[in-house]
A protein has these predicted regions:
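Conserved MFS/SLC helix-loop-helix module at the cytosolic interface between two early adjacent transmembrane helices
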Residues: 62-98
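A late C-terminal transmembrane helix in Major Facilitator Superfamily
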Residues: 322-354, 362
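Extracytoplasmic gate region of multi-pass secondary transporters
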Residues: 32, 205-246, 250-253
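C-terminal transmembrane helical hairpin of 12-TM major facilitator-type secondary transporters
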Residues: 267-313
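Helix-to-loop junctions at the C-terminal end of transmembrane segments
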Residues: 63-76, 255-268, 349-350
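Helix-breaking motifs and short loop linkers at transmembrane-helix boundaries and internal kinks
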Residues: 43, 96-101, 267, 288-290
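Cytoplasmic helix-loop-helix junction between adjacent transmembrane helices
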Residues: 108-141
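Helix-loop-helix hairpin linking two adjacent transmembrane segments in secondary transporters
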Residues: 128, 137-185
Length: 389
């Protein structure tokens, strides 16, 4: 099969990675619209709505744990087909469920299937010799579908309710299902290339890389979750801040596409430093009650750099592990970081330390991420395959 020279993957495999990864987190990417509909249609309060989203995020991340077993034993194409069918079934059932406990169980089942698909996508992207470009498209697909969802879901909800979301997800996955055969068979077909268990210093690059992903997501999620509080404390009108954050979504798409275009053309260390440095600068611009103009500049810069630098961060892990085991762990760490940031920032705000402490802590997280990535890059010569010496 002909390969894309700029990507290094078969066209159908690249398409499968991007499309499956876009559909799987669609509920989380359209959370503002979905949360509003949960309240209007099901009469749920903030606590129960939060629990539904937390269950989806947790189940998607915990799909990593069974993947440690099947990733080296089962054909990834069969796993993708089975997970896609489970995702379709869970969403079809969700469309006709009006009981909270039943809906929560179905959303957990859907997210577990989606998380397994995400593991296949992330690990398959790691097999590309230009993983940074693949991860750029991986991020772009999620952002584009999320933006489209935020645009089309409100009028669909008005006419069809939550069925529009769940039936739509099932339909999209049905359309993606034929692409499951485009994934590689995984390690099951490459047993002769297996390597011995990692020992000694060989773990250091992988551990530092995973730590970098954890603190990166913890720092950005703490800021993005409570960025509305910065606007409120600065007496910025909710309508103005809402428009700014909507535009920021477009900047996020632009950031990931820029990463795809640049790929390996520029030195990765400089790209990591540039992206994380500008994200830190954006956080600093949010300090001390910013004006509307400063808030807008900070929010737009933060979102652009977030999606710009993420593909290069994931590519650092992919360089260490072409078989996908380390990238499987990254799926778990991403979910942990997304949950950890708000979990720490919320109590910090309630104790009276204020948003300034949250912002400074988040900036420190990004600096820690950069330091850990530099250690990973420096130690790369210690490994030959994955994290093995």
């Amino acid at each position: 099969m002909t390969l894309f020279p700029a990507i290094g993957l078969a066209p159908l495999r690249l398409l499968a990675i991007v499309l499956f990864a876009a559909v799987v987190p669609c509920v989380l990417m359209t959370a503002p619209a979905v949360a509003t509909q949960y309240a209007l249609q099901l009469g749920l309060g903030p606590a129960r709505i939060g629990q539904l989203f937390s269950v989806e995020l947790a189940a998607m991340s915990l799909a990593t744990l069974p993947a440690y077993y099947w990733q080296s034993r089962w054909d990834w194409r069969q796993v993708a087909r089975g997970a896609a069918l489970l995702f379709i079934g869970a969403n079809l059932a969700s469309a006709f469920s009006d009981q909270y406990v039943t809906l929560m169980a179905l959303r957990a089942l859907s997210a577990l299937a989606g998380g397994s698909l995400m593991v296949v996508c992330i690990a398959s992207a790691a097999q590309s010799p230009q993983a940074d470009r693949v991860y750029g498209l991986w991020v772009s697909g999620q952002l584009i579908l999320g933006a489209v969802g935020l645009w089309v879901l409100p009028p669909l909800f008005a006419n069809y309710g939550l069925k529009a979301l769940y039936l739509g997800l099932a339909m999209l996955m049905v359309l993606c299902l034929p692409l499951a055969g485009a994934f590689s068979a995984g390690k099951a077909s490459n047993g002769r290339h297996a390597v011995s268990p990692p020992t000694g210093q060989g773990w250091l690059p992988g551990l530092c890389g995973l730590f970098a992903v954890l603190v990166f997501y913890a720092g950005l999620s703490a800021v993005w979750t409570f960025i509305g509080s910065v606007a409120a404390d600065s007496a910025i009108e909710p309508a103005d801040s809402g428009r700014i954050l909507s535009i920021a979504t477009l900047l996020g798409i632009a950031g990931s596409l820029c990463a795809t275009l640049i790929g390996p053309r520029w030195p990765r260390n400089r790209l990591l430093g540039l992206g994380l440095g500008l994200m830190t600068a954006a956080i600093c611009l949010l300090l001390d009650a910013p004006s509307l103009l400063r808030f807008a500049g900070a929010a737009l810069l933060f979102k652009f750099c977030w999606t710009f630098v993420l593909p290069f961060i994931l590519a650092c892990l992919a360089d260490l592990d072409r078989h996908g085991r380390l990238m499987n762990s990254a799926n778990l760490v991403i979910g942990g970081g997304l949950a950890l940031g708000p979990a720490i920032a919320g109590p910090v705000l309630e104790t009276g330390l204020g948003m300034r402490s949250v912002l400074i802590g988040s900036a420190c997280c990004l600096l820690l991420a950069f330091t850990a990535l530099m250690i990973t890059r420096r130690c790369r010569f210690l490994v030959t395959t994955g994290v093995h010496p």
